[in-house]
UniProtKB/Swiss-Prot annotation:
Binds between the large and small subunits. It comes from Escherichia coli O81 (strain ED1a). The basic unit is a heterodimer which dimerizes to form tetramers. The heterotetramers trimerize; 6 large subunits form a core ring with 6 small subunits projecting outwards. It is an enzyme of class 4 (lyase). This is Ethanolamine ammonia-lyase small subunit. The keyword Lyase applies. It is found in: Bacterial microcompartment. Adenosylcob(III)alamin binds at residues 207, 228, 258. GO terms for cellular component: ethanolamine ammonia-lyase complex; ethanolamine degradation polyhedral organelle. PANTHER family: ETHANOLAMINE AMMONIA-LYASE LIGHT CHAIN, ETHANOLAMINE AMMONIA-LYASE SMALL SUBUNIT. Its EC number is 4.3.1.7. Catalyzes the deamination of various vicinal amino-alcohols to oxo compounds. Allows this organism to utilize ethanolamine as the sole source of nitrogen and carbon in the presence of external vitamin B12.
């Protein structure tokens, strides 16, 4: 599927929702104010700001314009300069700040108020707290007994597509991208004439939990939107794991199709929704997912 087809799907889905599709845009570095190298290392600078990300720490550069262009072209840690064999103070502080942000999003909880505000049913895995979630991934792959009963009682049975949202390893990925990915995704699936299950939120879920969900609800395709393990300074990245006719005993990782890096600096959520709709349709047509699908 090429870019033109993706844009057509996005326009079609957004039109059905009564919204205007966003204009196509190229992925660009979000840094600004890169006019010239800056050597000031003010302690008052917000280390998460665009100004801090645009900072060029190379002193007395031979070609300042080359550094400026390089800095504009990537979000990587380039042009930070050195103090002898060591990084400069601001570069080190930014590294530590980004590391702290990544740790925070792993340890944070998705607020119960947020889940209720979205009108989502909330269930959980066998995990009871964040510490256990990080140390016992096997328990995050199974629903607790109460969750199983709740799904049987409150969710649509035997859907063509079941959409599940889970916090995973990034709370920010869910709360930041939810509004831009779930409404167009649900609208696109319904517009395609598919029977769509009741979307719900799984707290402390791991990827393999979608196998049990699919088995309980009799879903043909299960789509799990889960927070990715955050990188330095990027804590908002979402992944989609889609699988056809999952079974706890037989489904393996090669049976899943993954779309990763869903966020404003990667694959935009609205565009990802269109790609996921197309993927679900192809899975149902081919009755397969993962490496068993024909490209």
């Amino acid at each position: 599927m090429d870019q033109k087809q993706i844009e057509e799907i996005v326009r079609s889905v957004m039109a059905s929702m009564g919204q205007t599709a966003p204009a196509p845009s190229e992925a660009k570095c979000t840094t600004t104010n890169c006019a010239a190298p800056v050597t000031s290392e003010s302690c008052a600078l917000d280390l998460g700001s665009a100004e801090a990300k645009a900072w060029i720490g190379v002193e007395n550069p031979h070609r300042a314009d080359v550094l400026t262009e390089l800095r504009r072209s990537t979000v990587a840690r380039v042009c930070t300069g050195r103090a002898g064999p060591r990084p400069r103070t601001q570069a080190l502080l930014r590294f530590l700040a980004d590391h702290s942000r990544s740790k925070d999003t792993v340890l944070k909880e998705v607020p119960e108020e947020w889940v209720k505000a979205q009108g989502l049913l909330e269930v959980r895995s066998e995990i009871s707290d964040k510490n256990l979630y990080l140390t016992r991934p096997d328990m995050g792959r199974r629903l607790c007994a109460e969750a199983v009963e709740a799904l049987k009682a409150q969710c649509v049975a035997n859907p063509d597509v079941q959409v599940v949202i889970s916090d995973g390893l990034s709370t920010d990925a869910i709360t930041v991208n939810y509004e831009e990915i779930l409404p167009p995704l649900m609208a696109g699936l319904k517009q395609a004439g598919l029977k769509v299950g009741t979307p719900f939120f799984v707290r402390y879920g791991r990827v393999k939990i979608e196998d049990q969900i699919g088995e309980i609800l009799g879903a043909k395709v299960v789509i799990l939107l889960v927070g990715e393990r955050p990188g330095l300074g990027q804590s908002e990245s979402l992944s989609c794991y889609a699988v056809y006719s999952p079974r706890m005993a037989t489904t393996v990782e090669a049976d899943r199709t993954c779309i990763s890096n869903i966020h404003q600096g990667g694959t935009p959520p609205v565009e990802a929704a269109a790609v996921i709709v197309d993927l679900a349709k192809r899975m149902l047509e081919q009755k397969a997912s993962g490496i068993n699908m024909t490209r």
